[in-house]
């Protein structure tokens, strides 16, 4: 998951198929990691602590997800805005627009075709150059987000070394039976 998350940093405006493949592979590993976390939650604690353990695991997952989303969104927004402010007007100026109109085009790009049409001096060449620079600014921001995910992944990989080995607990023994089961009397707690 760490590897394919970091490989998302290879994004360009022209390699959509490769990025879709990396997203699918990364999502597969993410799903596998969810099952692993459930196994550690359920098998790593005594029977009477299952509810508490599951609650803490769920809370940690939701809190971690919220924190990661806030961090990644902040990185994406700030990096893309900074990069677009530097590259979009420069690309439009190289394509023949004045600097003032290029700045107006930068402000109009996220607003759609109607806003772009109102910018004076906009030509097809300038619009094409500015649009490509805008796409590259997003690609750059996504690259920074993908590389920043490495820090979380490396910390997670280091935490794996401190996890309990669950192999001795992977047996045929059933810890808890349903109360209406014929083996309900084997339950330690009722």
Predicted features, each with a name:
Residues 1-93, 142-163:
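C-terminal module of multi-pass small-molecule transporters
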Residues 8, 86, 104, 132, ...:
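Charged/polar, solvent-exposed surface patches and flexible loops
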Residues 36, 83, 98-103, 172-177, ...:
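Short, surface-exposed, polar/charged, turn-prone segments marking secondary-structure boundaries
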Residues 75-130:
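Extracellular/lumenal N-termini and interhelical loops of multi-pass eukaryotic membrane proteins
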Residues 109-190:
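Transmembrane-helix exit segments and adjacent C-terminal regions of multi-pass membrane proteins
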